[in-house]
C-alpha cells in the first residue's frame, strides 16, 4: 500500500476514535482492563511479539487427509486454507486478502495471505491485549471498521486489516459491557452472536435466548429487549430497535443482495424426538415480523409450558426452508462471486454443524439453496458432505460459517477441527 494512503488511514483512525469518544456513552471498566488505555491510544504493556499458529506438521497433514472424504459436485475441490483453532464466524477484509475469525473462547484470529496464494501465510491473535469473552461475531462496515460482538458487548476496530500487527490496536465500544442484554440474563448457552451490516447501513445482531424452551415469565422481557430475536442499531450504538422476534437461536444471517431481504438460520427445540422439530431458514422482508418461537417451531407446536394450547399468533411468518431435525443450521452467505457455475449465482450456501440430540447423527455438511424469481426459496440440496462418518457416527469436522472470498472461492470454518477450508471450481 502506498505510504500516502497509510498516512491517510492513520489520520482517519484518530479522527474516528475522536468521534466515537463523543458519540459513545462512558462506561467504567474493571481496573485490569486495557480497553481504556487503547481508546486513548496508549500502550498496554502487552508483549508485542504475538505467537503464530503453525500451518504445517502432523495436524495440518491430518486435516488435509480428512478432506479427502468430503464429497462435492463435479468440478469442485476443497483444500485446507488455514489452521485456525476454534474457528467460527468469518469476516473477509474489504481491502486486503485477510480474514478475521471469531471464536466462542477468548480469541479473534487475524488470518493473513501475504502472497495472494491458495493458502494463508500467517495466523495469529488479533488484539491480544484485550480479553475477549465469546467473540463469536465478526463483520465489516462499508468504510473498513471491524465489528466484534461478544455475548454482551460490541467493539469497533478502525482499519483493523492495516493495523493488526501489534498487541495494541485502536478500539471503540459501540455497546459497552453489560448493555447488549441485561447482565442478569447473561448465559453460557446460545450466547454466540452473529452480525451483519444491512443495506440501510445499520448493524444487525442476533440474540439467542438461553433456554431449550423459554419460561413464560421471560416472554415480555425478551420481546422488549430482542433476546430470541434480531436487533439493529446505528453503527455508533444509537437508535437500537428490535428487528425480528420469535427466533430461538440464530447463528447465521445474510442479506440477499438483489432484494435486500434478511435471511437467517434458526436452531430449534431439543428433546421432542429424532425427526422433530425440523431446522429453519427464514426470510425477513420488513421490521417487526414474528417467526413463531416458542409457540411453534418449523410447523411443530411446542408442548413445554403449554405453548401448544395458546392460539398461534396471527402474524407468524413460516420458514422458507425446513431442514433435517437437529442438524444445527449455523452460518450462511449469499454467493456473490463469479467463479462458480451459473446454477450457484442466485442463491445462498449454509452450514450444518451436526446433531447431538439424535439417535442417528446428521449434518456436518454444506447446503445450497436456490431462489425463485420472486425471491423466495426454491430447492435446497447437499453441496458438500463427508465430515461425518455415517458408519461410526464420528465427526471429523463440524462446519460453522461460510463466506465468499474475493476470487469467488468459498471459505468454510470448522471449530471442531480448527480450520478454514477453501472450495474452488474448475471446469470438470
Q: Which residue stretches match the model-derived regions?
A:
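Blade-level signature of beta-propeller repeat domains, shared across WD40, Kelch, NHL, RCC1
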Residues: 403-428
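Conserved beta-propeller blade signature
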Residues: 98-102, 145-148, 202-206, 261-265, ...
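Beta-propeller domain segments
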Residues: 30-73, 192, 209-217, 225-228, ...
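Hydrophobic core register within WD40 beta-propeller blades
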Residues: 90, 138, 195, 250-253, ...
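Blade-loop segments of beta-propeller domains
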Residues: 88, 109-144
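Surface loop/turn motifs at the tips and blade-to-blade linkers of beta-strand repeat domains
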Residues: 80-85, 126-131, 175-187, 242-246, ...
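Residue-level detector of Asp-centered blade-edge/turn motifs that repeat once per structural unit
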Residues: 94-96, 140-143, 197-200, 256-259, ...
